[in-house]
């Protein structure tokens, strides 16, 4: 599937498909719109997917702050207006993008909202714990790579090939995602993601649980939460464990909670089998 690129007030967007039904897709905290490449490739003919690079990421990296998830939600709503979203439009987000989707859906009606391994408030940090330290502990290698430079595109690809989440799950979609993220001169290549944008958004996620709770309760559209049973490093501890998700599923009658078997936080949007489940939920009647 080939993306057609455009800009909306400096935000890079990409469109795949030509169908009348619309999906708007939002990526994670250090990612880019190319994290939706596997979804775009399998898109049914009656659908169009619009993905966007969030402020401070991808080809939207040059947009200024302030950052924070409410700012990203405003950008999503601006893109929705630009592409002609209507009451039949589906909104989805992966990881941090799921939280952005919640904030956007609290302000505008969508046909449904599909949250992919994100969207539920994290427990408050213990007293004295610095949000930046909590973010670093949670993201691990994903944050480390933003501080590094790479001698070649192949070296950056190799970094991702060695990531435990992609062991045995490498694909053309993953490689295209990785190469899209690179910028800078040969010999000193780096990720396009702006470290301060990532830190600012991470602080917001770890300190604004009340705002997320209010937004979740304000969403009128039916919501589907798709959870990966394994985490960012393919470990047994998921991003959203059962004891976090169950109370929210009970609290919000419009929320359907589902675990997608045999995937981790990354492969839930890259692995063909996992993507088939995701697409089924996105395009359900």
Language-model features: where?
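Alpha/beta-hydrolase fold catalytic core
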Residues: 1-23, 44-47, 137-139, 246-247, ...
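Conserved HGGG/HGGXW glycine-rich cap/lid loop of the alpha/beta-hydrolase fold
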Residues: 16-62
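Active-site loop/oxyanion-hole signature of alpha/beta-hydrolase fold enzymes
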Residues: 54-92, 263
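Conserved hydrolase catalytic core segment
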Residues: 87-130
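A catalytic-pocket lid/entrance helix-loop region that shapes and gates access to the active site
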Residues: 116-151
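Alpha/beta-hydrolase
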Residues: 147-237
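Conserved loop-alpha-helix segment in the C-terminal half of the alpha/beta-hydrolase fold
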Residues: 218-263
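Catalytic histidine-centered segment of alpha/beta-hydrolase-like enzymes
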Residues: 260-272
């Amino acid at each position: 599937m080939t993306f057609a690129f455009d800009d909306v007030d400096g935000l890079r967007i990409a469109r795949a498909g030509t169908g009348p039904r619309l999906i708007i897709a939002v990526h994670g905290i250090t990612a880019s719109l190319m994290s939706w490449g596997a979804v775009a490739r399998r898109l049914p003919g009656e659908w169009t997917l619009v993905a966007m690079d969030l402020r401070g990421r991808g080809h939207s990296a040059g947009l200024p702050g302030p950052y924070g998830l409410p700012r990203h939600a405003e950008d999503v709503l601006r893109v929705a207006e630009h592409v002609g979203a209507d009451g039949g439009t589906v909104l989805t987000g992966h990881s941090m993008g799921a939280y952005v989707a919640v904030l956007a859906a609290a302000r505008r009606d969508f046909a449904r909202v599909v949250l992919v391994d994100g969207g539920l408030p994290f427990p408050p940090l213990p007293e004295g714990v610095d949000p930046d330290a909590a973010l670093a502990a949670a993201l691990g290698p994903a944050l480390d790579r933003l501080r590094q430079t790479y001698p070649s595109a192949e070296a950056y690809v190799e970094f991702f090939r060695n990531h435990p989440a992609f062991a045995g799950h490498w694909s053309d979609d993953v490689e295209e995602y990785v190469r899209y993220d690179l910028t800078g001169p040969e010999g000193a290549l780096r990720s396009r993601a702006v470290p301060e944008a990532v830190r600012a958004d991470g602080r917001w996620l770890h300190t604004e649980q009340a705002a997320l709770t209010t937004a979740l309760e304000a969403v009128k559209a039916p919501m589907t939460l798709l959870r990966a049973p394994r985490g960012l490093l393919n470990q047994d501890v998921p991003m959203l464990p059962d004891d976090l998700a169950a109370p929210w599923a009970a609290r919000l009658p419009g929320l359907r909670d589902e675990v997608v078997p045999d995937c981790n936080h990354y492969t839930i949007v890259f692995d063909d089998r996992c993507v088939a489940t995701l697409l089924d939920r996105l395009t359900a009647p």
